[in-house]
Amino acid sequence: MNNFDLNNRVAIVTGGAQGFGHAIVKRFLDSGAKVIIWDIDKKFIEKAIEDSGSKNLSYQIVDITNYNEIKKNFDEISSKNKIDIFVNNAGVAGLNDKVWNYPNEE
């Protein structure tokens, strides 16, 4: 029994091609969501798509350290779909302060 019904929901998962993000993607797909992976490694994305076997999984190559790239891709998706879920899972190396202390450009 699945009490986690996401039928007709659209989710974006950053860093969704592997690790914890990929586990989230699989759970969302199993629960009926349409999922878009945002990741920078096409090799891992292709493997994730192949492993899922789901027609409800798509991807965009997105560098989440680039604000303009995030905005462009988010606007592209939201012009066609209502985004119901956004999981900000991807990690960014090199931050030495609290994330809210950084301007968008960083």
State where each predicted segment sits.
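The beta1-alpha1 cofactor-binding region of Rossmann-like NAD(H)/NADP(H)-dependent oxidoreductases
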Residues: 42-43, 60-73, 104
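Conserved mid-core segment of classical short-chain dehydrogenase/reductases
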Residues: 93-106
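Glycine-rich phosphate-binding loop signature in dinucleotide/nucleotide-binding domains
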Residues: 76-82
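Structural signature of beta-strand start/N-cap positions in the alpha/beta core
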Residues: 10, 34, 58, 82-84
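Rossmann-fold scaffold of SDR-type NAD(P)-dependent oxidoreductases
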Residues: 14-15, 83-91
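Conserved glycine-rich Rossmann-like NAD(P)H-binding loop of the short-chain dehydrogenase/reductase
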Residues: 31-47
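Short, conserved SAM-binding/catalytic segment
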Residues: 48-54
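Canonical Rossmann dinucleotide-binding motif of NAD(H)/NADP(H)-dependent dehydrogenases/reductases
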Residues: 3-35
